[in-house]
From Swiss-Prot:
Site for Important for catalytic activity, residues: E118, E140
Bilayer-spanning residue ranges: none
Start and end residues of each stretch annotated as 3-hydroxyacyl-CoA dehydrogenase: 306-714
Naturally occurring in which organism (per UniProt): Escherichia coli O1:K1 / APEC
Name of protein: Fatty acid oxidation complex subunit alpha
Gene name of the record: fadJ
Quaternary organization: Heterotetramer of two alpha chains (FadJ) and two beta chains (FadI).
Amino acid sequence: MEMASAFTLNVRLDNIAIITIDVPGEKMNTLKAEFASQVRAIIKQIRENKELRGVVFVSAKPDNFIAGADINMIGNCKTAQEAEVLARQGQQLMAEIHALPIPVIAAIHGACLGGGLELALACHGRVCTDDPKTVLGLPEVQLGLLPGSGGTQRLPRLIGVSTALEMILTGKQLRAKQAVKLGLVDDVVPHSILLEAAVELAKQDRPSSRPLPVRERILAGPLGRALLFKMVGKKTEHKTQGNYPATERILEVVETGLAQGTSSGYDAEARAFGELAMTPQSQALRNIFFASTDVKKDPGSDAPPAPLNSVGILGGGLMGGGIAYVTACKAGLPVRIKDINPRGINHALKYSWDQLEGKVRRRHLKASERDKQLALISGTTDYCGFAHRDLIIEAVFENLELKQQMVAEVEQNCATHTIFASNTSSLPIGDIAAHAARPEQVIGLHFFSPVEKMPLVEIIPHASTSAQTIATTVKLAKKQGKTPIVVRDKAGFYVNRILAPYINEAIRMLTEGERIEHIDAALVKFGFPVGPIQLLDEVGIDTGTKIMPVLEAAYGERFSAPANVVSSILNDDRKGRKNGRGFYLYGQKGRKSKKQVDPAIYPLIGAQGQGRLSAPQVAERCVMLMLNEAVRCLDEQVIRSVRDGDIGAVFGIGFPPFLGGPFRYIDSLGAGEVVAIMQRLATQYGSRFTPCDRLVEMSERGESFWKTTATDLQ
């Protein structure tokens, strides 16, 4: 039986050809190499039908146009030449679409990304819906690649080089109103009239490109271009620290096309695409993509999740406010916040207002939609309105007795099916559930701050948590837009446990004489978004160090922080950015204010600030301890798989994505090399660097954590 086609042609009575995109058996339309023959057959029919007036591409999927190319095609390429051929085939197909003698219009609703936008760019005009689901972008850089089907050449000519570079270098996605303002689309219409609007455009002469703004025309000239690429190159190098080769190649390819013409530009694009596809950075980033997709499909347990119709939150502080926001505004669930103080409720409501009002100001959201989402959140100082909540998230202070009291109160005031989920970062879930009448419905749900930005949550069942409670909590996390990993109920869980020795070692080097800015710069150069000392300031020194004694009590001396350093800093009322002084000093303009190292830190902790270590040596000491602890977590079944370990580190800590996560990174170095480095460091700095047994065994056997495929585990 012949497989259904992803592209089908229908000709209307008014002689407009409608090409419907509908990849069989898939929720999302993605482009595959085998579709080229289908599109070419349709192009041939269009060319042969002299009665046709225009062509419209439209998707049959309810919420996406084309989400991009199928990434598996790249993984199947064994050489740069094979990947280059793939790009050239894509370029050729887009050129054939563009060469049609009648107007070709893309009718866009939902995600139009990567190869999907490149197809739309090959059309002569574009119409999109004003729906929030409609986004347009070229996110290939996030996979260590560049657009390979003409995107680097068509986009700068359509919207201007500086705007195009921002989109291609960052993977930034535009909403409909931004897209029409920049000239990326010709019109924005309601979804109900999308097809008719596209048909009307197709009946006209080919839409002419809007003239570029004067600034963009100047920047496209030789002098403006030279200045622009120099400035953007410098800014990009600072941002990527040279760790992402794709950004450098994007600049090179776009400039080639502008300076030497489209033929040279397309040639450079295809060659760069092929070479980037073979880089370890792209392979690691694609592995992260596959792993995160896999995690999002994981139900957490074999049991079916319980229905989720409404949620309660205990505590209206920073975390409670953030959790209320993602629950109401991302998951779309009614939220009831309980706080002992009305000010706590007001704080939580203001948190959501600020987030939504920012979207309204940026024209990402209508005021009516803001009001609709805010109406989902309400507050109370007692348990009024909690009787039928399906799940309660506790976000009160880190105090065991208080959390146990919350469990008792929820069991008294809520339905018998209600799940109690604690947002603890350090307390054992088993202890929180110790006196529960229904311990099987108690679970940990650990969010990271700021809640609306951090993609990871840890879901922590204790020994008696039911499979259905796990599945229901995983379901909620996904509805909130989070990537959940299920971890074991042991001190520090996973993320904080691997983060603690990393930060401890940074503080230890500080006491040895390394300068604060040198330590932070070394880890940023390695690939972390911020250095460990700045991270401590951002989280809050009081908050970030609270877990240290818990971990030391559980795991011993390797988690001990340098004596008296933390207490000296806290006793000097240094909490980090939140009170304007930590290891750094901050101005008065909140989170955006500039920071500078406070030189008073050095005498306060008895350090000289005269370092001797190179940046790679600093990074090595911090990172090796993190890797060792990650392997211990796998060995102790704190994490269920290396997949979860890599995702947890990348999404929870900012472990360099281009290295693929701790386990991918160990594999790339080789377990033998990691063991050798750690043994050398143990000789130099002490037993905390002793490699764990599993690493030593893997070294002796020549084993790796991951198999060669993207999703299979060893």
